[in-house]
A protein has these predicted regions:
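A glycine-rich phosphate-binding loop feature that marks nucleotide/adenosyl-phosphate handling sites
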Residues: 17-26, 101-105, 129-137
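Short, Gly/Pro- and small/polar-rich lid/capping loops
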Residues: 8, 131-133, 220
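Glycan-recognition surfaces
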Residues: 1-99
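Carbohydrate-binding surface patches
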Residues: 136-175
Length: 230
């Protein structure tokens, strides 16, 4: 910590990232001395949104650097899933971002444009709810609904993995302003509904979860939604 003091004295404008180190360095004193912190050692795994939601209770979102590792081979659903996960904090882009198709670049730019509109909610808002029914992260099956509120505006991040069921979020008194998703969705009667997947997952049950068979893709569904009080 004394070394950090010397570094900041020598370079007052330096931006310091605190390496997560498995969570060992996420403590108030050190976090008060750095600009940002890797939210976790999780890098490309499907569990990132669930880990990020848990860590949001410990690290302020304005300091929580969340990986969005984007690959050219990823489906559009996987790309949206990764970007929406990173919207719980400071987006850290990685992967094949300099070598992607025009269509994939456009999808990423759309997500970053949405994030620019809600980043004040991310940084300064209060967590309104984290509803996650996934019981085993290493073979996740289920969905998570993350809500953050700032004034009259509400950010809703939905992640569904392997579970093909529709996801419904009651939001009485709100109206939608913008969405970032590749899934079909509706907002009727004060209920946000992410449509059911068209696929059925294939895998084997493991510790209250579902592991895909070798060569079988996971079913990724996600969306970021901005609402305001009506």
């Amino acid at each position: 910590l004394a070394w950090l003091d010397k570094l900041k004295a020598a370079l007052p404008d330096i931006v310091i990232e605190n390496c997560s180190s498995g969570g060992g360095r996420i403590e108030p004193k050190r976090m008060g001395m750095v600009s940002m912190c890797s939210f976790s050692d999780a890098h490309e795994c499907a569990e990132i949104p669930f880990v990020a939601a848990n860590v949001s209770r410990v690290i302020p979102a304005r300091q929580s650097q969340i990986w969005a590792v984007l690959r050219e081979k990823d489906t559009p659903s996987r790309t949206v899933y990764s970007l929406c996960a990173a919207m719980m904090g400071r987006i850290c882009l990685s992967g094949d971002v300099l070598d992607m198709s025009k269509e994939k670049v456009a999808l990423i730019q759309e997500g970053l444009s949405f994030y620019a509109q809600v980043k004040d909610i991310v940084a300064e808002g209060d967590i309104a709810d984290i509803d996650c029914n996934i019981e085993y992260y290493r073979a996740p099956f289920g969905r998570q609904i993350y809500q953050k509120r700032l004034g009259d505006r509400l950010l809703v991040l939905i992640h569904a993995l392997q579970d093909p069921s529709a996801v419904e979020v009651p939001l009485p008194g709100y109206r939608p302003l913008r969405a970032y998703t590749d899934c079909a969705w509706t907002f009727e009667g004060g209920v946000l509904r992410l449509a059911a997947a068209q696929e059925t997952p294939v895998g084997f049950s493991f510790a209250e979860g579902l592991r895909p068979l070798s060569g079988q893709d996971m079913i990724f569904r996600a969306g970021a939604f901005l609402f305001e009080k009506s």
